[in-house]
Each structure stands twice: as C-alpha cells, then as structure tokens.
Amino acid sequence: MMSNPEDFYTVYNSIMNLDDKVRFVTVLDADGKILFGGQREGIQNYLSDEDQKKSIKHVTEAWFNRKQFSSGIGEGKYAMAEYEKVKRFTFPLKTSSNIVYITTEPEVDHYSFVDNVLKIIESI
C-alpha cells in the first residue's frame, strides 16, 4: 500500500522531473490533507494561500464524488482541467485512497504527460 513518505517522495520527484513545466505536485488523502509535495522553485503563485486551500478541497471533493459512478462506468484514471494560466491534473493512487494533484504550465503536452504520470504511478 502506498502510504509511506518514501513512496510519496518517489512519485513527487519522478513527476517533477518529467518536465520543467510542472509547477506543483502533491499527494492528498481523501480529506484533502497534504501528505507530501511542493512546488517548483522560482514559480509565481497565481492563488493566495487561502485560495490554494480551497482549490485543493475542491479537487479532492470532485475526485471522490466521481467515484459514485465507478460501478457503472469504471474507475477513473485521471481528471484534467485547463485554464488560461495552468493545467490541473488529478490521478488516483491505486493502492490507497490518496490522490496526486499536479499543476503545470498550460503549454505542457498533456497526452504524453498523462501517459508518463500513469506509468510512474503504476510502477510504485
């Protein structure tokens, strides 16, 4: 079960190293509590600390609300939202009820990025 800090660090570090357009990577529990993560040095925060907390809460609630449909349409693999200034991704960690929340610059190639993140998560 992926619930120890070494696994979280491996996920964080591997995703951060995929592309220098990755801004933020964090592992969240089902309540939106940050278990591990951080942002790339030198990037500009677009949201205040309070709005970042609200965004994390929203992402967590949205992901776990989608699970109510999994018996009919299958388990979610990831969710993505694209904004003018960032792309936001959410991935489940298969061996726990934790999720990985990632933001990138908008120009990241999300097709290859998603493929690579899924490979990282599946390898842990």
Model-inferred region functions:
Residues 1-124:
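Non-catalytic interaction/Regulatory regions outside core domains
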